[in-house]
A protein has these predicted regions:
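Enzymes that bind and transform nitrogen-containing heteroaromatic metabolites
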Residues: 1-141
Length: 141
């Protein structure tokens, strides 16, 4: 444990620890785990593993994604070094065009775009660029 955080060696170990911390039964049913939240915070390979699996310990599969979208005010290309997997969004009728290993998702809430007062994004040259951000909540269909 470091500063109140628990380090674990794998996604499975983290989900078992989340279940135990919530006091859910070891042999939990879907009703037992419905009230237990676990936040999976990347990197990109951890997101990819979590989204593609249907056998996550104590949780089964990821049902909700909360993500932050960013874009640079100046329009500069911000490359970054970690990417979350692409999510297939449903159309207004609730249909997805293609099958995705990460499932089909619908946006259930989205905040208005805001101008960050203190945050910035670095472009390829290392220049600080003002940014906008928005929060989205997605549910698996």
């Amino acid at each position: 444990e470091r500063d109140g955080a628990l380090w674990v060696p794998s996604l499975d170990a983290a989900l078992y620890a989340a279940r135990d911390a919530a006091g859910a039964p070891v042999e939990a049913t879907p009703a037992d785990t419905a009230a237990v939240d676990a936040w999976i915070l990347g990197g990109g390979s951890v997101y990819a593993e979590a989204l593609s699996r249907t056998d996550l310990p104590a949780f089964g599969r990821v049902e909700t994604v909360e993500r932050t979208l960013f874009y640079c005010q100046e329009g500069n290309e911000i490359t970054g070094d970690t990417r979350a997997p692409e999510l297939q969004l449903a159309d207004s009728a609730g249909n997805c065009e293609v099958s995705s290993p990460n499932g089909c998702w619908r946006v259930t809430s989205e905040s208005a775009w805001e101008n960050s007062e203190k945050g910035y994004l670095l472009d390829e040259s290392g220049t600080k660029n003002p940014m906008y951000f928005s929060f989205q909540r997605l549910e698996r269909l």
